[in-house]
């Protein structure tokens, strides 16, 4: 990913070629980029860099769905970027504190929708990760689509985790 970030920031390289050369594949047919060599590299990306990266990824035709794992922000740039997506899937553990935080964020998104004339709130869906019947609960909000949950899996190897996750049929509803 560091090479792609450098290409995006320098604007001197062919981003499409850099994406193609950096693409990795796993045994499950998932295409992905390796983590950055230095974690701070990703902090240097601005919204324009991310938009360009997404456009180049879409042009490459190597992905059915694009997953962006990043921090949530209420800034206008990030809002406009997220509103351009077909779906925005948030992941929560279903703990009471996580549910309250998500509900508050969802209310803020509704306000931003009205301010900017967008429709992000209607694109939001939730997946529960590490869901436990003892410490987790689903949100009671008829406006938010809850796709499903992935139970807590202790001590599993990465391949075992992927197998368990892929057994969830709700993942077919993404995209």
Q: What residue spans do the PLM features occupy?
A:
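Phosphate-binding loop that captures ATP/GTP phosphates
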Residues: 1-32
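ATP-dependent carboxylate-amine ligase catalytic core
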Residues: 20, 35, 45-47
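Conserved P-loop NTPase mechanochemical-coupling segment
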Residues: 29-41
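Active-site/binding-pocket entry motifs
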Residues: 38-39, 133, 156
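Short glycine-rich substrate-engagement loop in P-loop NTPases that contacts/grips substrate
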Residues: 41-54
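Phosphate/oxyanion-binding active-site loops and adjacent basic polyanion-contact surfaces
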Residues: 46, 98-101, 162, 166
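Conserved catalytic-core segment of NTP-binding enzymes
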Residues: 52-65, 70-146
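NTP-binding/hydrolysis catalytic cores, primarily Walker-type P-loop NTPases
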Residues: 151-175
């Amino acid at each position: 990913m560091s090479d792609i970030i450098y290409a995006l920031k320098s604007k001197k390289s062919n981003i499409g070629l850099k994406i193609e050369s950096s693409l990795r594949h796993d045994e499950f047919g998932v295409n992905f980029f390796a983590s950055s060599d230095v974690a701070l590299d990703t902090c240097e990306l601005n919204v324009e860099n991310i938009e360009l990266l997404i456009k180049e990824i879409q042009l490459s035709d190597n992905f059915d769905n694009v997953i962006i794992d990043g921090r949530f922000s209420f800034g206008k740039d990030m809002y406009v970027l997220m509103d351009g997506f077909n779906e925005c899937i948030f992941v929560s553990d279903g703990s009471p504190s996580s549910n309250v935080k998500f509900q508050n964020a969802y209310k803020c998104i509704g306000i931003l929708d009205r301010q900017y004339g967008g429709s992000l709130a209607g694109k939001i869906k939730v997946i529960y990760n590490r869901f436990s019947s003892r410490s987790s609960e689903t949100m009671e909000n008829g406006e938010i689509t809850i796709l499903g949950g992935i139970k807590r899996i202790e001590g599993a190897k990465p391949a075992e985790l992927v197998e368990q996750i892929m057994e969830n049929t709700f993942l077919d509803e993404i995209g």
